[in-house]
A protein has these predicted regions:
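A membrane-pore/channel beta-structure motif
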Residues: 34-36, 55, 103, 107-115
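Outer-membrane beta-barrel "beta-signal"
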Residues: 96, 100, 169, 217-231
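Transmembrane beta-strands of outer-membrane beta-barrel proteins
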Residues: 39-41, 50, 58, 62-64, ...
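Extracellular/periplasm-exposed beta-strand and loop segments of Gram-negative cell-envelope proteins
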Residues: 66-93, 115-153, 180-218, 222
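Transmembrane beta-strands of outer-membrane beta-barrel pores
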Residues: 45-47, 66-72, 99, 110-116, ...
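Cleavable N-terminal export/targeting peptides
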Residues: 1-36, 214-216, 231
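Transmembrane beta-barrel domains of outer membrane proteins
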Residues: 42, 51-53, 96-98, 159-161, ...
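Outer-membrane beta-barrel channels and translocator barrels
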Residues: 57-59, 100-102, 163-165
Length: 231
């Protein structure tokens, strides 16, 4: 099964589960004093965020969020300069447990993780060292790569603030996404030696260097702030 097909199936399953849980929770909450729904706008290390929170009991809330953003920066790996483009896109289903009945809460859940990183070499000189061999920029063309992550990513964290409160409320989250070991692919594009086996071998060596740098993203820190409104 392809990665894109798996993501579509997981996303559909998450939507179906979310709708089912919300309907069930609404039925239960219709007879208690803790019924409530809140929507939010916010942002953090996963990007800009929209969220919907539904009370399940006095101290338990269901939260659905969608995060999206783009960010670019420059970096260097094994002597090669790269332009990196981060594409953030994720949808999460979370359970907030207000352990002591106040603002403090524990949060667990999972993300449908479409976060990706695109990389392209920034060749400023006449030569470029790929792996352990020096080539001319004309021979290499440019190096292009993609870094992808597990489609399903568990989340664990804690925070402060009650989404289901009177009127507006501010909530803070701090946690970790367990998105697994990244998968790196790298290729040479537009060079006179793009099909040369020596260059291809060195590109594979360069890919391994990128993989080592990307491995640190298996645990992704989450810090976010949101403004909720109960209606």
């Amino acid at each position: 099964m392809s990665n894109n097909l798996l993501k579509k199936k997981l996303r559909s399953a998450l939507k179906l589960l979310s709708i089912s849980v919300l309907l069930a929770v609404s039925a239960v909450n219709s007879s208690n004093s803790y019924a409530g729904t809140a929507i939010a706008l916010g942002g953090g290390t996963l990007g800009y965020q929209v969220a919907l929170s539904q009370s399940m009991s006095e101290n338990l809330n269901l939260r659905i969020t969608h995060n999206a953003a783009s960010q670019s920066f420059d970096g260097e790996t094994d002597g090669v300069d790269y332009d990196y483009d981060f594409e953030f896109s994720s949808t999460s289903l979370l359970i907030d447990w207000h352990v002591f009945g106040g603002g403090f809460r524990l949060t667990t859940g999972a993300l449908i993780n479409d976060n990706e990183i695109h990389a392209q070499s920034d060749i400023n000189g006449l030569t470029l060292e790929v792996g352990d061999t020096v080539f001319t920029s004309a021979e290499v063309g440019r190096l292009e790569g993609d870094i992808s992550f597990d489609s399903y990513a568990p989340y664990l964290g804690f925070g402060w603030g009650r989404a289901i409160a009177d009127g507006f409320s501010v909530v803070f989250d701090l946690g970790v996404v367990f998105q697994g070991q990244p998968e790196v692919s790298l290729q040479t594009v537009g060079g006179t030696l793009s099909d040369n086996q020596l260059l291809l071998d060195e590109v594979e060596r360069e890919e391994q260097e990128l993989q080592e740098d990307a491995d640190e993203f298996d645990l992704y820190p989450v810090v976010s702030l949101g403004l909720f409104y109960r209606f």
